[in-house]
From Swiss-Prot:
Record localization: Secreted
Protein keywords: Secreted, Signal
One GO MF term: signaling receptor binding
Tissue: Detected in the cerebellum.
Main function: Potential ligand of the IGFLR1 cell membrane receptor.
Name under which the protein is recorded: Insulin growth factor-like family member 3
InterPro entries linked: IGFL (IPR032744)
Presence of the UniProt keyword Membrane in the record: no
Family in the record: Belongs to the IGFL family.
């Protein structure tokens, strides 16, 4: 009787072992809908393609699009920020780099360049 008990215990152990090994295939998601690995990027309530576009002030822009920063600079809103450095009659602006993966803010971002007014003397013939 003792060998029969050992055989039964061995069969039970093998069965439990095989069930545990095959558990990975039973945990697969079930459903007929589209299954995405990453969340879809949104700008407000609109979907956009981050390899061609970006979200800037709840507007979808092309990665190539530029904007004015002060009266003397242009910047790429998808990659840079236009930050006021001083206020008053002679406003100064800085263009700073956006930090990827974060909501960029002027006081935390590294400086790319200064937008100072270049005073050029134009000579007319």
């Amino acid at each position: 009787m003792r060998p029969r008990c050992c055989i039964l215990a061995l069969v039970c152990w093998i069965t439990v072992f095989l069930l545990q090994c095959s558990k990975g295939t039973t945990d697969a998601p079930v459903g007929s809908g589209l299954w995405l690995c990453q969340p879809t990027p949104r700008c407000g309530n609109k979907i956009y393609n981050p390899s061609e576009q970006c979200c800037y002030d709840d507007a979808i822009l092309s990665l190539k699009e530029t904007r004015r920063c002060g009266s003397t600079c242009t910047f790429w809103p998808c990659f840079e920020l236009c930050c006021p450095e001083s206020f008053g009659p002679q406003q100064k602006f800085l263009v700073k780099l956006r930090v990827l993966g974060m909501k960029s803010q002027c006081h935390l971002s590294p400086i790319s360049r200064s937008c100072t007014r270049n005073r050029r003397h134009v000579l007319y013939p």
